[in-house]
Amino acid sequence: MLNKELEIFKKNLSSYTQSCRKFFLKQGAFSLYHSKNMDNFIKKAYDIVLKDYFDDFSPPSDNIPFCVLASKAYANNSLCFNESISLIFVYKDIKAFHLKPMIKAFIEILNDAHLQIDSVILEFNGLYNASNELKTSIIQTRFICGSRILFKRIKIKFESILKENKNDFAKLLLENFKEFDIPFIKQEFNILKDFGGLNHLRSLESLLVLFKTSPKNYALNFIDEKNLSELRLAGDFLLSLKS
């Protein structure tokens, strides 16, 4: 029965991959639709793993100390079609749950289905010990599936880490803008070399999230609504071009 579910899962993902270009007709929102569809495939893969490990005795997801988070561009629903999906797997090491083999099986299912993922596995109590470069992946995160109880605790830790390391994270992100140190008149947009392209835009978005202190978009402290709208349209164009 499980093998049949896996085959159906792989078939559905393959069919989606072949037909997903239709989302280009969604008037610039194709990346949002694509990200949401990826969410559904990841949730389905998790359901298959739970059934494999718990059979008919699976506890509610909230009671399993594990959750899957989207990070980086995927968390912001600004994912290109040909781009790896950034995931963070967070678990709490509890005696009653031997979760490492389950997480490994989860990743194997995604890989076997040819879903490109860029994943990080973190133990809840070890979040503070992760390297700064790894910690920057938590600047933009979004819950996909798993325990919401654990996710609430993770959010508190993430907020604490971001607050304590804000300046260090900002320095790491600003490293991506070294090319802009040359005089403006000599700067030339070059999407092939990603000068003024999608990676710079994403680094800018991470900086804005890092220093955000209210629901209002932090960019509005520097530009008006019209310019922000133009920036978003430019981002949509770059996403479609890269896809």
Specify the residue positions occupied by each region the protein language model found.
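Generic start-of-chain signal for non-secretory N-termini
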Residues: 1-30, 108-113, 126-164
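Helical scaffold of the NTase/Pol beta-like nucleotidyltransferase catalytic core
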Residues: 1-66
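Short acidic (Asp/Glu) and glycine-rich catalytic loops that position anionic groups and cofactors
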Residues: 17-19, 85-86, 117-119, 134-137, ...
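Conserved catalytic core of two-metal-ion nucleotidyltransferases
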Residues: 35-43, 49, 58-61, 99-153, ...
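Active-site nucleotide-donor binding segment shared across nucleotidyl transfer reactions
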Residues: 43, 47-95, 100
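Helix-loop-helix transmembrane hairpins and adjacent membrane-interface loops
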Residues: 59-60, 76, 81, 93, ...
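Short, well-ordered alpha-helical packing segments
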Residues: 86-89, 103-114, 202-205, 232-242
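Conserved nucleotidyltransferase catalytic core and NTase-mimicking acidic/glycine-rich helix/loop elements
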Residues: 164-243
